Each structure stands twice: as structure tokens, then as C-alpha cells.
């Protein structure tokens, strides 16, 4: 099987995945609304708090923005939330940049990890990217976010030298997934 055929098969598999809340049990991934901003702020804060000492203060502040900044980000591009029984338990956002969808702020609080929420969020974003004819997705993560890096690699992202090597003074790896 050629690389292109393999990628096409992978994308078809993603596109055939669960579409509704019931197919993912009691977890729904949906586009965020403005009134989700306070909960997204909490999820980001909870998700990155354990790494606070490893970030520069500027990077931590940028990774855990207040809801006013979250609302501005929602105007720049789509934001998704994973919701379970009315509670937001994960989030990711994206910025369109030409035919590339730049992902940012993927977060799942520690007590929610290990339940495939990250994968569910990535599947939702990949569907959006595929349906809107993006050619690739990119994401950056700091080296100490080993669980996230592993999740991205398992989802088909590959490390790339494209993009900045740091985020407000904190080192990052850049990753790309061709669609």
C-alpha cells in the first residue's frame, strides 16, 4: 500500500467513527459556545497547573488564558469541548492558516486522563479539517508533555522542524499531520 493510500484509509476510518453522543457513551464533543469560556478557562488551568514550574511565567500565562482571551480565540477559529453529563472535561482550539489548521490549547485535566478524551477531541478536529478541505494540521507541545506528545504521534502527527522552537521561552516540538 502506498503512503497516500495508507493515509486515505486512515482518514476514511476517522470519518466513519462515532458521530453522536450516544456512540461515545456519555461524552459529547461539540463546538464551544461563548458561555463555555469560564469552564474552558478552568480546564486549561487544571490541565497545565502540574507543569507550571516547567513553563516560563509568560508561557504558563499564555497556556492558561482568562476567559476574555478564550472568547477572542473563539473568534479566530473553532474551539471544541468534550462534555460529560453537562461538565466540560476537555478542550482544543484551532486557527485556520491557509490550507493548514493550526491546533492549540488541547487540554484534559489530570483526573480525566486515560479515558481517550484527547483522541476524541483530535478525531473531531480531524473531521472538521477533512470536511473543510484542509491539507494538514499542525500542533506544538513542550517536551515535558510526554503523554500529549505520545497521543499526537499515535494519531499520526510527525515531528517537524517547521515552526518556532519555543513558546514564550519554553521549548516546544512542532508536529504535522498531512490529510
Where on the chain are the PLM-derived regions?
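Acetyl-CoA-dependent GNAT
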Residues: 14, 31-37, 41-105, 109-111, ...
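Short glycine-/small-residue-rich flexible loop motifs, especially phosphate/cofactor-binding loops
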Residues: 19, 126, 149
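Conserved glycine-rich acetyl-CoA-binding loop
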Residues: 87, 109-123, 132, 143-150, ...
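Conserved N-terminal entry element of GNAT/NAT acetyltransferase domains
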Residues: 1-35
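Short, well-ordered coil/turn elements that cap or connect secondary structure elements
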Residues: 24, 74-75, 131, 154
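C-terminal "cap" of GNAT-fold acetyltransferases
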Residues: 71, 135-179
Amino acid at each position: 500500500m502506498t503512503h497516500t493510500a495508507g493515509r486515505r484509509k486512515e482518514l476514511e476510518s476517522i470519518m466513519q467513527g462515532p458521530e453522536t453522543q450516544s456512540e461515545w457513551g456519555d461524552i459529547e464533543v461539540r463546538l464551544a459556545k461563548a458561555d463555555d469560556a469560564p469552564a474552558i478557562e478552568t480546564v486549561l488551568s487544571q490541565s497545565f497547573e502540574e507543569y507550571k514550574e516547567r513553563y516560563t511565567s509568560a508561557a504558563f500565562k499564555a497556556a492558561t488564558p482568562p476567559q476574555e482571551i478564550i472568547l477572542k480565540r473563539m473568534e479566530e477559529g473553532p474551539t471544541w469541548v468534550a462534555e460529560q453529563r453537562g461538565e466540560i472535561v476537555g478542550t482544543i482550539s484551532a486557527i485556520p492558516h491557509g490550507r493548514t489548521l493550526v491546533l492549540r490549547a488541547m487540554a484534559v485535566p489530570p483526573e480525566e486522563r486515560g479515558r481517550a478524551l484527547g483522541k476524541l477531541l483530535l478525531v473531531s478536529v480531524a473531521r472538521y479539517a477533512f470536511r473543510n478541505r484542509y491539507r494538514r494540521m499542525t500542533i506544538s507541545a513542550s517536551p515535558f508533555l510526554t503523554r500529549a506528545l505520545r497521543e499526537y504521534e499515535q494519531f499520526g502527527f510527525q515531528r517537524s522542524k517547521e515552526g518556532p522552537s519555543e513558546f514564550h521561552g519554553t521549548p516546544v516540538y512542532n508536529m504535522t499531520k498531512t490529510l
